[in-house]
């Protein structure tokens, strides 16, 4: 192999330069031309070269910077000539089509790739066409063939790629190197580092990304890069997006703004992909280049062709990254606008990278003495970027650790809501989940100790609590003996249990088994079970049965209600057991429900909605901070509390009509008052477009919308959390404060509350009411307050009914207090 390279300042001096080149005879001659000349002038140069060397194969592309013997030169033409002794060449040109794989097949077919093909050098007319599939070439045996090269750079004289004596546009030109004696080595260097936070792809169409984290991607790029609306192309490609871990270097290059909106990328991202901005500084590759130079020297490479990214010149003001390669072998090449790299068995399209193709003809010689390589230059840039990279890594680790701690704490809190604190059994929440999958041949029994209140009053709460644990063990033993692995036991109240089990038994047989168990249990003296101070303690049980075959279409709540109603019926009629299927619909209950529906309907028609307000006070000072506005209806002079009618009308058309009247009355009374106030929104309100439009108009009518708070009850009735979050975010933009109500109640989906990002969270009264007596409840409340602080939300303690509860709540760090101790609801005048 013989190699020589020359610089040509201009076309006029080309003849003089060519006369100085005396080429030896060889099997093949490859002339690579890298030049800022126009298409017409470079064709003249090509014809001049072919007139002197008609057998030569010419290949090249437009550029403004070339690499000549390891040095960077600007605005000159480089001729790089290689004479091969044992290698033959093939050439190809392929116009682009929409089928990238088909383009690759045509390119491989024209190049006649075989098992003797060692490498391909290819230049593409435009960076946008650098798609991996277009350059993933294989020989006739299906083995991959490395492809090096890149995309032509736009110059003031135009952009072109050259093959022999013709320039091409919208095409790729290539030559293939074939020869058993030819050894090639490929490599590349890039050090893309993720910068900043992680974004999630939330809207994408093909190769266009429209939104990250539900925000237009153009706005995110403009904000982070400090760019104008047009987003310069150089800026875009300098900051691609990285998916996954840094070590994978999985990059997505923004190609430009799309007319349809969004940014177009070199390959498509998927919905929900997580990405980060990344940035590369070429000085980070220097150490790796020096290591590669040592390896190439050991392989006795005779020629190195470098295809470098033009953007690297913005950072590499010297030729440090080229010096070690030039010390190994003559190093020539050009600066491209995108680079092709074959590494680790895969063809890749690189950006912001330096790639090389090193060659040798013949075997390694033992008599050659290696030339010492230059010393590695010391500098501060590489250590600085390493420090920045590790700082980001440490920050990510801290964030992950904090997230794990919050998840662990949340799991503990969530688990405490799913377990009964007295018995340790799964509670009503878990039972409801189980009943959601109530299947054939399954049965539900609701069970209660009917004399438990008397036991508590006579023997005290410690004795009662111990009895609950002992009874739970007795029930579990019975179930394990009779229905091993086919039953579950749940605590659904104080002295109340439920069991779900599978058995091919009818109601009569189940009644018989239960009766025998009750007869046996009621004659047990529980003194041996840890009650030494009790001479004799007996219990009385009753139960209600629901079988799936009788109530196949009922919801979990209805199933449990049916079982409890059957149990109550048994107790009221002095029985141990009642099958819900035997109960007839109680006409009085139905009539009462119809009566309430009639009264509410009458109140809505007459617009007899009454607004009450209860103060919410600042902790410590007890100054009124706002009012919670509460609905009442007036019927024939009687003020009716919502607990009497809301449960009945929840699933009817009356509910949304009542909500809109409540909104109207509340805003009419509060519009000209100075105090802040809040109203309650149910899941039905959040799903009603008419109610939401009515509420929006009311908020806009207030001079200061920041006075308005919207209390959202986060419950299992919410089916579409995305819609709820969307609605709340909309009202937040109008100025309203988003408040989560009853947090910590039997149902709280903490993940969704985190996504909702409320400004205020109200702790459920069931947690606060007994914190002066129940230490465990107090600890749970304390943890919830801390969790709210992590979420950057203010907290309100509800049901503050005495001074002790008030003081404890303040000590826990709540921001506001609400309850009878501070003020009862009163009618707004």
Swiss-Prot record:
Domain EAL: 593-829
Domain observations: The EAL domain is required for c-di-GMP PDE activity, and the degenerate GGDEF domain is required for full PDE activity of the EAL domain. The GG(D/E)EF motif in CdpA is degenerate, having the sequence GVGEW.
CDD domains per UniProt: EAL
GO biological process, one term: regulation of single-species biofilm formation
Organism annotation: Vibrio cholerae serotype O1 (strain ATCC 39315 / El Tor Inaba N16961)
Gene Ontology CC entries for this record: plasma membrane
EC number: 3.1.4.52
The gene coding this protein: cdpA
Reactions the enzyme catalyzes: 3',3'-c-di-GMP + H2O = 5'-phosphoguanylyl(3'->5')guanosine + H(+)
Cofactor dependence: Mg(2+)
Enzyme type, top EC level: hydrolase
SMART domains reported in the protein's UniProt record: EAL, FIST, FIST_C, GGDEF
Disruption phenotype: Cells lacking this gene have a level of c-di-GMP almost four-fold higher than that of the respective parent strain. Disruption of this gene also results in increased biofilm formation.
Induction notes from the record: Is up-regulated during biofilm formation, and is also induced during a late stage of infection of the host. However, cdpA expression is not regulated by c-di-GMP concentration.
Record protein name field: Cyclic di-GMP phosphodiesterase CdpA
């Amino acid at each position: 192999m013989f190699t020589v390279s020359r610089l040509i300042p201009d076309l006029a001096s080309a003849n003089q330069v060519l006369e100085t080149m005396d080429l030896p005879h060889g099997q093949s001659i490859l002339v690579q031309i890298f030049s800022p000349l126009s298409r017409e002038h470079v064709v003249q140069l090509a014809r001049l070269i072919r007139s002197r060397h008609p057998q030569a194969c010419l290949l090249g592309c437009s550029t403004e910077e070339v690499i000549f013997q390891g040095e960077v030169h600007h605005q000159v033409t480089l001729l790089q000539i290689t004479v091969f002794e044992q290698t033959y060449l093939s050439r190809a040109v392929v116009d682009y089509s929409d089928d990238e794989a088909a383009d690759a097949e045509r390119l491989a077919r024209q190049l006649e790739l075989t098992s003797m093909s060692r490498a391909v050098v290819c230049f593409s007319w435009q960076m946008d066409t650098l798609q991996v599939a277009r350059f993933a070439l294989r020989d006739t045996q299906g083995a991959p063939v490395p492809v090096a090269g890149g995309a032509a750079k736009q110059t003031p004289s135009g952009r072109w790629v050259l093959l022999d004596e013709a320039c091409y546009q919208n095409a790729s030109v290539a030559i293939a190197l074939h020869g058993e004696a030819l050894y090639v080595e490929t490599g590349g260097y890039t050090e893309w580092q993720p910068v900043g936070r992680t974004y999630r792809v939330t809207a994408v169409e093909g190769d266009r990304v429209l939104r990250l984290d539900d925000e237009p991607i153009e706005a995110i790029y403009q904000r982070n890069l400090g760019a104008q609306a047009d987003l310069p192309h150089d800026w875009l490609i300098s900051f691609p997006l990285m998916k996954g871990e840094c070590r994978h270097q999985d990059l997505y290059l923004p190609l430009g703004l799309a007319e349809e909106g969004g940014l177009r990328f070199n390959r498509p991202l998927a919905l929900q992909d997580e990405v980060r901005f990344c940035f590369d500084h070429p000085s980070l590759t220097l150490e790796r280049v020096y290591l590669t130079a040592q390896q190439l020297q050991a392989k006795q490479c005779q020629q190195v062709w470098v295809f470098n990214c033009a953007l690297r010149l913005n950072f590499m003001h010297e030729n440090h990254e080229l010096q070690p390669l030039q010390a190994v072998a003559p190093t020539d090449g050009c600066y491209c606008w995108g680079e092709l790299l074959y590494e680790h068995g895969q063809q890749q399209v690189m950006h912001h990278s330096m790639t090389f193709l090193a060659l040798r003809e013949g075997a390694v010689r033992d008599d050659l003495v290696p030339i010492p390589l230059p010393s590695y230059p010391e500098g501060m840039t590489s250590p600085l970027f390493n420090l920045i990279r590790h700082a980001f890594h440490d920050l990510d680790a801290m964030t992950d650790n904090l997230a794990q701690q919050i998840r662990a704490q949340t799991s503990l809190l969530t688990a405490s809501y799913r377990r009964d604190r007295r018995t340790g059994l799964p509670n009503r929440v878990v039972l409801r989940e189980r009943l959601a999958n109530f299947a054939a041949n399954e049965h539900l029994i609701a069970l209660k100790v009917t004399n438990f209140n008397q036991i508590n009053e006579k023997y005290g709460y410690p004795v009662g609590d111990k009895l609950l644990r002992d009874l739970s063990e007795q029930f579990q033993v019975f179930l394990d003996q009779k229905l091993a692995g086919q039953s579950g036991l749940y605590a659904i109240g104080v002295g109340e249990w439920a069991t779900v089990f599978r058995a091919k038994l009818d109601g009569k047989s189940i009644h018989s088994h239960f009766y025998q168990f009750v007869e046996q249990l009621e004659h047990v003296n529980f003194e041996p079970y840890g009650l030494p101070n009790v001479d004799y303690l007996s219990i009385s049980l009753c139960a209600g049965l629901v079988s799936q075959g009788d109530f196949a279409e009922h919801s979990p709540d209805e199933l449990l209600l049916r079982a409890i109603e059957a149990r109550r019926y048994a107790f009221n009629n002095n029985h141990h057991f009642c099958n819900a299927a035997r109960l007839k619909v109680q006409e009085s209950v139905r009539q009462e429900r119809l009566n309430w529906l009639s009264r509410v309907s009458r109140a809505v028609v007459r617009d007899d909605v009454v607004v009450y307000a209860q103060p919410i006070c600042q902790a410590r000072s007890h100054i009124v901070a706002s009012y919670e506005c509460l609905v009442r209806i007036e019927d024939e002079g009687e003020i009716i509390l919502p607990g009497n009618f809301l449960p009945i009308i929840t699933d009817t058309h009356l509910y949304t009509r009542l909500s809109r009247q409540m909104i109207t009355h509340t805003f009419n009374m509060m519009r000209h008052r100075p105090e802040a106030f809040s109203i309650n929104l149910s899941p039905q309100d959040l799903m009603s477009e008419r109610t939401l439009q009515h509420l929006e108009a009311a908020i806009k009518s207030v001079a200061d919308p920041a006075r308005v708070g919207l209390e959202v009850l986060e419950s299992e009735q919410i089916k579409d959390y995305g819609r709820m979050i969307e609605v709340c975010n909309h009202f937040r933009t109008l100025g309203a404060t988003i408040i989560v109500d009853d947090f910590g109640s039997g149902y709280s989906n903490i993940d969704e509350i985190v996504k909702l990002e409320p400004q205020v969270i109200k702790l459920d009264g069931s947690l606060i009411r007994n914190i002066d007596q129940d230490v465990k409840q107090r600890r749970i409340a304390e943890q919830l307050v801390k969790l709210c602080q992590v979420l950057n939300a203010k907290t309100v303690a509800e049901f503050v009914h005495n001074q002790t509860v008030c003081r404890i709540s303040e000590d826990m760090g709540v921001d506001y207090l609400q309850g009878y101790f501070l003020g009862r609801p009163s009618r707004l005048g």
